[in-house]
């Protein structure tokens, strides 16, 4: 049996550079890239070399810290202005993932009261490292809460990749499957391929197989038949942004799975950290939806599969209405139904815990 957690980390800090697992090359090639400046970091995020909301946040935090180390000035005011400009630059790399803004803003806030440039540089590194350490703990706790919703032998459908390589470790939607493996429970995962970038086919199946988790790959248009024929007991997905009312932006195709779950009468779960919940965004209507390069649809592995000049609509995300979501699973617990009241309460609980 494979070691359940023998899974490559997606991001590492190495003092003079950031090392990332190039998720664009998986599963055929396991390639690690060295990001040596802020432009490398921006490109890695925008080009999906690193992806998954928490991993994006971690990488951006390290990118901000790295750029700060490379900026030479004795003026603390000029240094902070440089950090703020870098923050805005990195924030432009992916407009939907709220973890990106959360991590960058956390680093900017961490140097609000420093007294020197050297102190600011050290603080930024420590804060970025802290974000990664905290995310690993958060993901494990999400997995423990999620696992309480499953029984031995359950067959669970997921989309995209909300796994270990999308986070610091364990993942969000995939975390319960690693913990089930650890505890000797048998859960079978059905992974939707996730067109057009194929994160489910390339990434989810790859990392689950590395850990010896039972996984079956399906194409996106097989979901309804799979739920019916394979007796799927639940759907679990990650999230890139959750609005205050529970509306959830996630990889394109998630909304369709939620509709299918409702039609078949099975639970539809969203697993995400508190940092993905954006209380300033009241509903899903306010969430910007990134539209990506048409070639992601018209080409596969560099080969054109559609006529030259065809019109293409390529949204990277869709928004699942809150009334289709059975529960939102966070590190602080499971929220069901009354999201406008219960989601803010999670943050109040977090604030009380930090004050103790």
UniProtKB/Swiss-Prot annotation:
Gene Ontology MF term list: S-methyl-5-thioribose-1-phosphate isomerase activity
SUPFAM superfamilies per record: NagB/RpiA/CoA transferase-like (SSF100950)
Cross-referenced Gene3D superfamilies: translation initiation factor eif-2b, domain 1 (1.20.120.420), Translation initiation factor eif-2b, domain 2 (3.40.50.10470)
PANTHER family, per the entry: METHYLTHIORIBOSE-1-PHOSPHATE ISOMERASE (PTHR43475:SF4)
GO terms of biological process kind: L-methionine salvage from methylthioadenosine
Swiss-Prot/TrEMBL site (Transition state stabilizer) positions: 160
EC number(s) on file: 5.3.1.23
Annotated function: Catalyzes the interconversion of methylthioribose-1-phosphate (MTR-1-P) into methylthioribulose-1-phosphate (MTRu-1-P).
Pathway membership, UniProt: Amino-acid biosynthesis; L-methionine biosynthesis via salvage pathway; L-methionine from S-methyl-5-thio-alpha-D-ribose 1-phosphate: step 1/6
Record keywords, A-Z: Amino-acid biosynthesis, Isomerase, Methionine biosynthesis
Pfam entry (one): IF-2B
Active site: 240
Keyword Protease: no
Species the sequence originates in: Geobacillus sp. (strain WCH70)
Residues given in the record as substrate binding sites: 51-53, 94, 199, 250-251
Protein name per UniProt: Methylthioribose-1-phosphate isomerase
Family: Belongs to the eIF-2B alpha/beta/delta subunits family. MtnA subfamily.
Keyword Acetylation: no
């Amino acid at each position: 049996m494979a070691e359940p957690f023998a899974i490559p980390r997606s991001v590492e800090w190495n003092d003079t550079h950031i090392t990332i697992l190039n998720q664009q090359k998986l599963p055929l090639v396991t390639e690690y890239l060295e990001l040596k400046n802020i432009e490398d970091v921006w490109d890695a995020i925008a080009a999906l070399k690193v992806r998954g909301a928490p991993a994006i946040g971690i990488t951006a935090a390290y990118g901000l810290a790295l750029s700060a180390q490379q900026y030479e000035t004795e003026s603390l005011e000029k240094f902070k202005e440089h950090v703020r400009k870098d923050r805005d630059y990195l924030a432009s790399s992916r407009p939907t993932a709220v973890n990106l803004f959360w991590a960058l803003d956390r680093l900017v806030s961490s140097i609000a009261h420093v007294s020197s440039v050297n102190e600011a540089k050290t603080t930024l590194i420590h804060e970025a490292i802290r974000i990664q350490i905290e995310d690993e703990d958060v993901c494990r706790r999400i997995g423990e809460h999620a696992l309480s919703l499953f029984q031995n032998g359950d067959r669970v459908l997921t989309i995209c990749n909300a796994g270990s390589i999308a986070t610091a470790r364990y993942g969000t939607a995939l975390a319960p499957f690693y913990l089930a493996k650890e505890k000797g429970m048998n859960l079978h995962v059905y992974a939707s391929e996730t067109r057009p970038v194929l994160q489910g086919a390339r990434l989810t199946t790859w990392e689950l197989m590395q850990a010896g988790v039972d996984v079956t790959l399906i194409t996106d248009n097989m979901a309804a038949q799979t739920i019916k024929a394979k007796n799927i007991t639940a759907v679990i997905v990650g999230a890139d942004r959750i609005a205050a009312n529970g509306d959830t932006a996630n990889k394109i195709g998630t909304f369709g799975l939620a509709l299918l779950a409702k039609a078949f009468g099975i639970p539809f779960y969203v697993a995400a950290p508190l940092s993905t919940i954006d209380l300033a965004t009241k509903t899903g209507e306010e969430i910007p939806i990134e539209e990506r390069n048409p070639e992601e649809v018209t080409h596969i592995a560099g080969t054109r599969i559609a006529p030259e000049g065809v019109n293409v609509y390529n949204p990277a995300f869709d928004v699942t209405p809150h009334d289709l979501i059975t529960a939102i699973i966070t590190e602080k617990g499971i929220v069901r139904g009354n999201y406008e009241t219960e989601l803010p309460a999670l943050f109040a609980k977090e604030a009380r815990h930090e004050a103790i």
